Amino acid sequence: MVKFMKEIQAPKFVSDKLATVFLAGSIDMGTAENWQQKAIALLQGSHWTILNPRRADWDSSWKQEIQNEQFFEQVSWELQGIETAEWVIVYFDKDSSSPITLMELGICSQLKPEQTIVICPQGFYRKGNVDIVCDRYRIKTAKTLEEAINRLS
């Protein structure tokens, strides 16, 4: 079987039923590590379709309100990605407060704890909270992005 990796960036949708991995986690355009590109590079040659919420055309001037069409589209795309993905990787950047990532972890803990893998490094200001949520809901954890990707089945 020929393996292929495909990346889909927000706000495009998956057109067919493929094995998907949603990349939830720190973005903070310009400050957080672009870990999504590292994940995509590590997944080259695999059969996974990557749902990447980091988008090249993001505009930080968009009002983060439900009435803002672009913002609504982005958040809706992310929620649908989490809901429908076969796996979710949740990555916390130790230098980011990552409030949306904390919310994404909460969603995953209720919707798909068995299909979620969390990377939360030492030094993340809420690591204790993240560790307790992962322990309570039996969410898999990994020390590195490489380890998380190797755990995808």
Regions found by a protein language model. Name each.
Residues 1-153:
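Conserved catalytic or regulatory cores that recognize and/or transform ribose-phosphate-containing ligands
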